[in-house]
Structures are given as structure tokens and as C-alpha cells.
Amino acid sequence: MRNYLTGKERLLVALLAFILPFSFAKAEVKEDGKTGQQGWYVGVEGGMPFGFSTFSSFGHDKTRLGWAAGLYGGYRFNSIFSAELSAKYGEMNLSAQDCCVERNYWLGSDGMLYNAGVLGMDSWEYANLKSHVRMGWYGARVNINLLGLFHQTANSRWDLAVSPHIYAVTTKADIQTISDDAKVMKGSTNWHLGYGADLQVGYQLTSYLKLGIYSGLTRLTGERMDGMPEYLHKNNFLWESGIRLGINLPFTNNK
């Protein structure tokens, strides 16, 4: 099997491997005798993903909003570090970009790109097609609360976190006509390594409930997420923004 890890991807894996041990460090006791909250938590999250591949969520005809929802659970080690596992499912619709429509590209039933319709073969103009993508994310992230680095904000109800993540991502793309959603090509399930980072802002509503928003990028290795031939466009990534609702479990320790 071809090795999809580039130098940048290896660097991200090494960075996570470097950061994770620090996440297990015991919270330091501050001068006022307080420490950051420690303990287990779970939550739900939902967002709107946008896909960028040969086709794009920002297509030639309109912008198409995707949706995603999932569960997460993790452990907060101190006021700076937490780590979590998550699972999420979502769907998107992507269509051709302006440049591909202007060049009058066609997709043949053999999955290849053509500059015109092909005699004796079913083929479709890019301008008339969209890719319906179903996705699953399964992975881990480390949250680094930047406000926890400063004494004045370490125990604030607010947090501002940078969250590197690594996912195993599944995609399955069916090619459909825009006009009537007729399926012209059925896709197969592909597995990808997904890597990237989120920026999160959260607020502790009560001792148990936390509300947050997030936005981040995830790059995918391997096959095109949209099931289209790779030509000109090298992009293969997601941009997702959404909300999170977390619950501190009863056996969380507040020190």
C-alpha cells in the first residue's frame, strides 16, 4: 500500500506525540491554593463542514452547506491540557468550480475526465453534476487552553483552545445530477488519514455544563473525497465550524 504520509504529516504526528505526555502532568498548585478543574467529561457537537476537492462546497452554481454531528469524551488534566476521543458522521454536497465549467469538462462512465462527450459511452457535463459525500470521523485531539497559561485567567469560566487532531476518516461519494438528484455513479468507501487543528472558544455555564464554538481545518490523505478525477485541483480538505455542549461527569475532581 502506498505511503501517504508526507513530511508535514509526519511533523504533525511527532508534534502530537510530543505534546501528549505533558497532558498527563499533574496540575500545579497556584499561590492562592487553587488548581484547574480535573476530571472526565462527555459531550455532543454539531457543525457545518465545507469540502474542497476537485469539486467544492462553493460550487459554480451555489454554496452548499453540509452537516455533521457526533459525540466526544475526554479527560481534563489541568487548566491547560485536556485530551479526548470523538466519533462523528456528516454529509456534504459538492459541485464543479467555475474553472472546470468554463473548460467544459465531462465525466465519462469510466470515471475519467474528458473535454467533450464521448461517443458510445455515457458521459455528463461537470456543470450538471454534484458529489454527495458521506463521511465518518474517528480520532483524537489534544486541547491546549491558552488562557490557562496566564495566572490571571487560569481559573476563568472562559477558555480559548488550540486543538491539534488526528482522525481516521471514511468517505463515500455518489455522483448525482444537480437537476433531479439522479445517481449516475455509485461510490465506494475510502479510508483516509485526517489531520489538522481547531480553534475553540468555550464558556463554563455551570459546574457541569460547558458551551463552546469551534472552527478548524482537516486535510485528508489518499483518494479524492468527492470521487472525481484529480486534475488541476490538488485540494482535499475540510473546513468545519460548529457548536459543542460538554458535561462534566459527577466524579470529576474540582481541586
Region roles according to the model:
Residues 1-32, 36, 142:
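Bacterial Sec-dependent N-terminal signal peptides
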Residues 14, 24-43, 151-160, 250-255:
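Outer-membrane beta-barrel biogenesis signature
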Residues 26-74, 171-173:
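Short glycine/proline- and aromatic-enriched beta-strand/turn motifs that initiate or cap beta-hairpins
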Residues 28-29, 77-178, 249:
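Gram-negative (and chloroplast) outer-membrane scaffold detector with strong preference
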Residues 34-42, 79-81, 136-138, 154-162, ...:
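Outer-envelope beta-barrel architecture signal
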Residues 38, 63-69, 132-138, 156-158, ...:
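Residues that define the transmembrane beta-barrel architecture of outer-membrane proteins
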Residues 44-48, 71-75, 140-146, 164-168, ...:
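Residues on the lipid-exposed face of transmembrane beta-strands in outer-membrane beta-barrel proteins
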Residues 54-59, 124-131, 180-187, 225-233:
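Extracellular loop and loop/strand-boundary signature of outer-membrane beta-barrel proteins
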